[in-house]
Amino acid sequence: MQFENTREFAKKLDNEDKISKYRDEFIFPKVNGKDVIYFVGNSLGLQPKTARKYVDEVMKDWAELAVEGHFYAEKSWWDYHERFSEKLARVVGANPSEVTVMNTLTVNLHLLMVSFYRPSGKRYKIICEEKAFPSDQYMISSQVRFHGYEPSDAIVEIMKREGENNFRTEDILKKIEEVGEECALVLIGGVNYYTGQVFDMETITKAGHDIGAFVGWDLAHGAGNIELKLSEWNVDFAAWCSYKYMNSGPGNASGCFINKKYHNKKDIPRFEGWWGHNKERRFLMEPEFQPEPTADAWQISNAPILALAPYLASLEMFDEVGMPALIEKRNKIVAYLEFVLHEIDEEVDSSFEIITPADQNERGTQLSVFLHGEGKELFRYLMDQGVITDWREPNVIRLAPAPFYCSFEDMYEFGQILKKGILSK
């Protein structure tokens, strides 16, 4: 399609957008009395209007039923998390038995490491990407130290080539092959938080398995953003947060994927608690643990119902729309944003550099823009004008036009504000 940098053309794209009505299902903050242009769905998604209703429902049941709400609430609490299984499975490309909702992301990665990081003999190394999200770095380092190894020896980082912004798949595969039988685990972020690069998870997973390692993925920036086929790719485990693209609310519950081939392995190590116990016998208070025959066996404590309520509200919208429709809109709106950025760059003779891959198969919703010659003054100007973006050192603005609630006219309007901000210096 031939794009045009005009308001009329942007409105035309909005009129053709099959999921544009969902914009009205979210609450926008306001600046100067106008809805903001919201580019940070990759940090915290907007609040769905139905979220309050779902939370109020739980509050009402708690007030009227108290402890009896576990079994007699409108959506009973003891099995509340089970309402997520099929819907989440469709988002991440899994069987319903392979997904569960519990805890938060780094907590879940630690728990999954109990099962999937089992160093012994010469097989003790973890392969990850350089400059992973800091929480992943801390988690991996602490796990390595816990097992008695030095991070400088046990952690192998995949590096970008000098002068390049993104990782090359062939370099990742080469590193996996080089480490070989010393590798216990490959653990990478499926979408790089800084550049927005999407990794070839299927190919990398196979390469890790070929050397006898487990392969897991941190999908903090992947779930609800990109096409995932975790079962088909034979991924061992994955975890993600729900408050970014999945709009569940600040710090809300994480999701986990555990490949079904591990569900009934009696020898798999795992930290256990009563909510992973056979649900038919859970309240018999038996001394011996009988695991659920699903990913729920990895649950430890009962679910935080008030937290899960807004998550369920959002997830039901995902189920209505479906990932294919979201990805179709995502590709189009990100391409239009990219076009607008290039147009403004030429008009003002600036020197923006989009460090996210240009190939739509290698990126999701996020475009990371390196502002050569610009600084935080421009970022602050955008924020003051109601353009909510995200700053990452050094000099990068991350823009993530979430397809559920961002419009094509937002992209045009952002371009005009950006141009004004540069020219007004």
Curated annotation (Swiss-Prot):
Pathway given in the UniProt record: Amino-acid degradation; L-kynurenine degradation; L-alanine and anthranilate from L-kynurenine: step 1/1; Cofactor biosynthesis; NAD(+) biosynthesis; quinolinate from L-kynurenine: step 2/3
Pfam families per UniProt: KYNU_C
Recorded catalytic activity of this chain's protein: L-kynurenine + H2O = anthranilate + L-alanine + H(+); 3-hydroxy-L-kynurenine + H2O = 3-hydroxyanthranilate + L-alanine + H(+)
Any GO molecular function: pyridoxal phosphate binding
Flavoprotein found in the keyword field: no
Keywords for the protein's UniProt record, in alphabetical order: Hydrolase, Pyridine nucleotide biosynthesis, Pyridoxal phosphate
SUPFAM superfamilies referenced in this protein's UniProt entry, alphabetically: PLP-dependent transferases
InterPro entries xrefs: Kynureninase (IPR010111), PyrdxlP-dep_Trfase (IPR015424), PyrdxlP-dep_Trfase_major (IPR015421), PyrdxlP-dep_Trfase_small (IPR015422)
Cofactor(s) named in the record: pyridoxal 5'-phosphate
Subunit and partners: Homodimer.
Record function comment: Catalyzes the cleavage of L-kynurenine (L-Kyn) and L-3-hydroxykynurenine (L-3OHKyn) into anthranilic acid (AA) and 3-hydroxyanthranilic acid (3-OHAA), respectively.
Protein name: Kynureninase
Organism of derivation: Christiangramia forsetii (strain DSM 17595 / CGMCC 1.15422 / KT0803) (Gramella forsetii)
